[in-house]
A protein has these predicted regions:
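Hydrophobic alpha-helical segments
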Residues: 2-196
């Protein structure tokens, strides 16, 4: 899958690579990405391939935070969507909203979050994730009451993993924003220009 233009519709900052274009330092990373990514080497992988050593380390981190994390997948994907919405990251939302729905996150929660609202009717664990991730990313700290609520729902490893998921997907959103990556051709961007 290739993405033709940048998010702004102008020439791409990083032209989309194909597997045939990868040099010897990029090829092993590209092959690993192709095995696990439903968007191939597009999205964040396109700029990551420009720095293959970093890209490999990030891919290892992504693997843990997506498939081996101690945070239940529904909540993990919810945390990713919270970051995607904060950053209005077209690719993050495009890639993860279906995964969140498949993992059992209620469509109403996804829709309200996408609209920029605090979701209503969240389960206790979802409320904890929303409050924790939102507080950490907006105030740059976690208050004692928020931490205490998190400790009632999650163990220490889960709290650390949740923090890492949030931080990782801020980095992914930054990478996507820097490269002006967007959704595949013919697909509707989740966030419209001018929306808050």
């Amino acid at each position: 899958m290739t993405f033709a233009q940048s998010a702004t519709g102008k020439e791409r900052r990083f032209p989309q690579l194909t597997m045939d274009q990868l040099d010897e330092s990029q090829k092993p990373l590209g092959e690993q990405v192709m095995k696990v990514s439903r968007i191939g080497i597009a999205g964040p992988y396109n700029p990551m391939l420009r720095s293959p050593v970093l890209g490999q380390r990030l891919l290892d981190l992504f693997h843990y935070l997506r498939w081996e994390t101690s945070v239940p997948i529904r909540l993990n994907e919810f945390a990713i969507l919270i970051i995607g919405r904060q950053w209005r990251s077209q690719v993050e939302w495009y890639a993860h909203a279906p995964l969140a729905a498949k993992a059992g996150l209620a469509p109403e929660i996804i829709a309200e979050l996408k609209a920029g609202k605090r979701p209503s009717n969240m389960a206790e664990d979802e409320t904890v994730v929303y409050d924790f991730v939102t507080e950490l990313t907006t105030t740059k700290k976690i208050s004692n009451p928020t931490f205490a609520r998190a400790k009632k729902v999650f163990n220490d490893q889960q709290i650390v993993d949740l923090t890492a998921v949030a931080g990782n997907y801020v980095m992914v959103a930054m990478m996507l924003a820097m490269a002006e990556e967007t959704v595949p051709p013919g697909k509707e961007p989740p966030f419209k220009d001018g929306e808050k």
